[in-house]
Regions:
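Macromolecular interaction modules
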Residues: 1-232
Length: 232
């Protein structure tokens, strides 16, 4: 399954509250019309709690599941997109936004997540050490057993998604991969943050630690197929 992470920045003349309200409300209505090309769609809203010691990459990150990259091209030419979400974007966000296409690798499945479940989630947008090629980074990262920046004794779900090679065709990608980590609550995150992930020496070899970013996010699961609105 292919996923696309967008990197949205609010318009400079509107508040964070208005940005998140418009994206979650009127804009989400447009997105629902893009099924079935868009298999799932989650809005990752930057939470008010800042991630300790790291900058956020954006104000929000739409997460879209597609059957293929070609599906993404189809989505961008659909009349429902052109006459709906596309026209609405300047109402709340800075255009045009950037993003990356990734392949989803579920490391720890965890219990099913219902559409309305409230969890603690962090998105880690990873930038490789400039000494590594994208292929070298991908190989070394995928060989690492756990999450890079936190322990995993208390986490609920862990997904590791490397940026697709096709993303590099026109030059370097904004990020080389994403780690998504969920916990049942903030206290469980605090425990895993304290225990740490990879050794600092390993992180320096693998990552550009200054360009790697992270943020707590509040998930709005807009398109989340399942048996009901409350089941995965």
């Amino acid at each position: 399954m292919i996923k696309v992470f967008g990197l949205l920045h609010k318009r400079s003349d509107i508040s964070q509250t208005k940005f998140h309200s418009h994206w979650k409300g009127p804009h989400a209505v447009h997105a629902i019309k893009l099924v079935p090309v868009m298999r799932r769609y989650v809005q990752n809203h930057k939470a008010t709690t800042a991630y300790p010691g790291m900058e956020p990459p954006c104000d929000g990150s739409p997460e879209v599941w597609l059957q293929s990259l070609e599906g993404g091209g189809t989505l961008n030419t659909m009349p429902d997109y052109i006459n709906g979400a596309f026209i609405d974007e300047p109402n709340f966000m800075r255009v045009r936004s950037s993003g990356i296409a990734v392949s989803e690798n579920i490391i720890i499945e965890g219990p099913p997540i219902g559409k309305k479940d409230k969890l603690t989630k962090v998105l880690y947008f990873l930038k490789r050490n400039p000494a590594l090629t994208s292929e070298q980074f991908r190989e070394q990262w995928l060989a690492h057993e756990g999450a890079l920046l936190v322990g995993q004794n208390n986490l609920r779900r862990f997904v590791r998604s490397p940026t697709l090679p096709e993303t590099y065709v026109d030059g370097d990608a904004p990020y080389d991969g994403v780690e998504e980590v969920w916990w049942n609550n903030k206290a469980d995150f605090d425990k895993d943050k304290k225990s740490g992930g990879a050794h600092k020496a390993e992180l320096r070899l693998l990552l550009d630690t200054k360009a790697t970013t992270a943020m707590f996010v509040d998930e709005n699961r807009v398109v989340w197929p399942g048996l009901s609105d409350d089941k995965d």
